[in-house]
Amino acid sequence: MTFRKSNVYLNLVNSYIIDSPQPSSINYWWNMGSLLGLCLVIQILTGIFMAMHYSSNIELAFSSVEHIMRDVQGGWFLRYAHANGASFFFICMYIHMGKALYYGSYRSPRVLLWTIGVIIFILTMATAFLGYCCVYGQMSHWGATVITNLFSAIPFIGKDIVLWLWGGFAVSNPTIQRFFALHYLFPFVIAAVVIMHMMALHIHGSSNPLGITGNMDRLPMHGYFVFKDLITVFVFLIVFSLFVFFSPNTMGHPDNYIPGNPMVTPASIVPEWYLLPFYAILRSIPDKLMGVITMFSAILVLLVLPFTDRSVVRGNSFKVLSKLFFFLFVFNFVLLGQIGAVHVEVPYILMGQISTFLYFAYFLVFIPIISTIENILFYVGSRNNTDDLK
């Protein structure tokens, strides 16, 4: 027996990474998991080194970021790699989730895997928001003010919760200090949940583009799929380096190069681009409480997907209607992101409300109806084939 199998610790690594049996038909969309792991490592490492030079005091937070950029050797690289790493983390995560939606990876027996994935998504959004506030630029200050103010919509106790979050009567020194403490903690929580995600994946193995159980047609992870993962890793690092070295502020906001000033309100208050679709859903509802409920529901509705999809065939590879509505959903989601970035005015108000309705309708109305129609068509087609054989 080889050492990697006899050693109790290396045997775990071996069973998950080296000898793990993978379906032979999986394509490059399945490489997003390894890229997400790489992004998490980049974020944790750059974050730890930046935390050595960052000060969470509100009087020094903005200056300490500039100190990292100007005085710390390689500090500019740490800051830009961390900021752009967050954007690339969400790019890979949205692609990973889109792959799961398209190929039906949320279906039984992988409901637990999907649920843990949604939890990782929520934790990642929370971590990104907390980190965005730590910069304490102009947009960070007002973003923190607006988003934390959402809790005031909770009846009876909402205002007390906001004061508790702030540690005062406005975003102030205690706010930034506790946000930084949580921002430092959450990536390690995410790493722990990622391990749970891999454990859940290990129970039934990866799905495949065909949507069938392929236990008889599998290959070891190393060196077939490890090599395939390395290809996308190199492509990712090239694109990531282009942004870090040549266009580091493309996915940021210029107002964050201005120190946070509670006396001056920006022309428009917007979060980072990866939160814009949910920000658009929040703004599409006139009532504050209902807007907050709708925004959180837009994330939690992902958890009902395994129960609303009643199709007898997993995935959309062989389903024309499901393909059409999936790509319409993707277009609608991108449109929500664009609407979240513009001012609340005509015609974007109505467009946001229609897009929000279509977002929820996809999960709660379209998928159940389409899966039922396709089940009937599959049944009719199978009966016709049976009659032809007779």
UniProtKB/Swiss-Prot annotation:
InterPro entries: Cyt_b/b6_C, Cyt_b/b6_C_sf, Cyt_b/b6_N, Cytb/b6-like_sf, Cytochrome_b, Cytochrome_b_C_euk/bac, Cytochrome_b_N_euk/bac, Di-haem_cyt_TM. GO terms for molecular function: metal ion binding; ubiquinol-cytochrome-c reductase activity. It is a multi-pass membrane protein. Binds 2 heme b groups non-covalently. It comes from the Eukaryota. Component of the ubiquinol-cytochrome c reductase complex (complex III or cytochrome b-c1 complex) that is part of the mitochondrial respiratory chain. The b-c1 complex mediates electron transfer from ubiquinol to cytochrome c. Contributes to the generation of a proton gradient across the mitochondrial membrane that is then used for ATP synthesis. PANTHER family: CYTOCHROME B. This is Cytochrome b. It comes from Naumovozyma castellii (Yeast).
